[in-house]
Amino acid sequence: IQKQDNGLYSITNLGALLFAKDLNEFARLGRKAMRVVKYKGINRLLIQKEEPFNQGYAICFENIVRYVNALLPSNEDVNAVQLSTTSKFPLPSVREAIANSLIHQDLYITGAAPMVEIFDNRIEVTNPGTPLVDVLRIIDNPPKSRNEKLASLMRRLKMCEELGRGWDRMVLACEAQYSPAPRIEVFQDSTKVTLFSEMEFSNIPMEDKLWSCYLHACLMYIQGDALTNKSLRDRFGIPETSSSSSSRLIKEAIGKNLIKVLDPNTAPRYMKYIPIWA
């Protein structure tokens, strides 16, 4: 809030965006409320559920995450003691994608709002605005926020952090479930991040295999390590008997100038690979 000359107080746009009970009460902010849409199947033909979250981000963020998680398909694990369910999607990645869409949106673009679209096989999180950093360097780039005050307040409210680790965590969570890495698509005035459910290696499109391989190399590099045939097999859950699959993917990634050999003089069996920019 800000104190006016007449002694009264006014609510700033930032205060309303975070703490408003209803964003529609503020002319410029009504379209900034996040929407969550659940579709039937894998296309947009039939909408099953649609929910706008009209409260300020600080009030409704956790509710958005819980609502989205509740709509995600899950697996039931039955053992002798109890029944448990596990999501088919990497939940830490879902949370990070939602937080990023709120923090990094371009608030000056009118007629557009952050949106989460849920399909049977993927989640698409879209926000107005394009990335401030090169997509290929999204893992190792220092943090850069479009809305510094918004990001700072959300960090103080423990909704996010400003350490630039969001994408690291998103990719690691996907790797833990053998899911493809989050796909980034940049359009003229918006950015879309797609998270995929569990998928067999043979069913992953080649473009997503290459992107996952590249981001795995980036993660290994910033940890002081390097991508190997074994680490890539572990990342995708490929058995050792199918090591030729990971070898072909590495060769393809080299051909696309995504990764390169660390030491060309190393024996092929012990070859290590790093991102092309390293």
PLM segments and residue spans:
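A short, conserved structural fragment
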Residues: 254-265
